[in-house]
Amino acid sequence: MLVAVDIGNTNIVLGFLDGDAIAGTYRITTKANHTSDEYGLFLTEFLRMSGFQPSDVDDVIICSVVPKVMHSFRSSIVKFLDIDPMVVGPGIKTGMNVRVDDPKSLGADILADCAGAYYEYGGPVLVADFGTATTFTHVSDKGVVDSGVITTGIRAGAAALWGDTAQLPEVEITRPDTILGTNTKTCMQAGLYYTFLGGVERTIRQFRRELGGEDFKVITTGGLGRVFENDTELIDVYDPDLIFKGMAHIYSRNVK
């Protein structure tokens, strides 16, 4: 079994890949002060919850945008599983070409998302990841990662709204029944939802316009992707496991 570890700014998500199936996924909060022993305990407990033992793990692949946490988690894997994990990063084989100004600066999570989208759904494809930050990345029909957009995630934008104002409360980010808010809470929910969705749609249209009307697929992922998947015709597929599919593909290209 392959364990895929996605270390993000907000959460660490573990995927247990048993053959072509994802046998289980687990999420914990990203904390820089967790020790390698704490991460090791999380990992072994999640394995047991899915019916596995540490000895069932054949290998591990890590995708991280938080270097300090990646170091601790990597140490936990070496200690608890006796495995030196593969790490998604510069020099790793993906089968795609990265043609941006500084290829080494492309986030490991974006690279894995693109691999998952391109090899699962084909190109050309626009990959939108609704995480702590919101990213859009274009992959050509030849598998070339050539352009993208990075902007504020909806949670970060929402936190600024109630964090920087005296009388606006924290609200759940969800699809409202109507844009016609009638109290502070519903006005905020409508504003957050529809302005973010509108920005997503405009971004997709702008990509299409500047790419000469290219008929790319739009694949979304990330924790909040599900909220928007059925409210716009511009999104083709929401795939919550996209990064794990990409990591599995990358692993298969690099394993000895």
UniProtKB/Swiss-Prot annotation:
Binding positions for K(+) per the UniProt entry: 129
InterPro entries according to UniProt: ATPase_NBD, Type_III_PanK
Cofactor notes: A monovalent cation. Ammonium or potassium.
GO biological process assignments: coenzyme A biosynthetic process
Catalytic site: 109
Cofactor(s) of this protein: NH4(+); K(+)
Catalytic EC class: transferase
Pfam families according to UniProt: Pan_kinase
Binding residues annotated for ATP, in chain numbering: 6-13, 132
GO cellular component: cytoplasm
Residues noted as binding substrate in the record, renumbered to the chain: 107-110, 184
Pathways per UniProt: Cofactor biosynthesis; coenzyme A biosynthesis; CoA from (R)-pantothenate: step 1/5
Subcellular location: Cytoplasm
Catalyzed reactions: (R)-pantothenate + ATP = (R)-4'-phosphopantothenate + ADP + H(+)
One annotated GO molecular function: metal ion binding
Superkingdom of the organism of origin: Bacteria
Major location category of this protein: cytoplasm
EC number assigned by the record: 2.7.1.33
Keywords: ATP-binding, Coenzyme A biosynthesis, Cytoplasm, Kinase, Metal-binding, Nucleotide-binding, Potassium, Transferase
Function, in words: Catalyzes the phosphorylation of pantothenate (Pan), the first step in CoA biosynthesis.
Family listed: Belongs to the type III pantothenate kinase family.
Quaternary structure (record): Homodimer.
UniProt name for this protein: Type III pantothenate kinase
Organism listed in the record: Bifidobacterium longum (strain NCC 2705)
Lineage: Bacteria, Bacillati, Actinomycetota, Actinomycetes, Bifidobacteriales
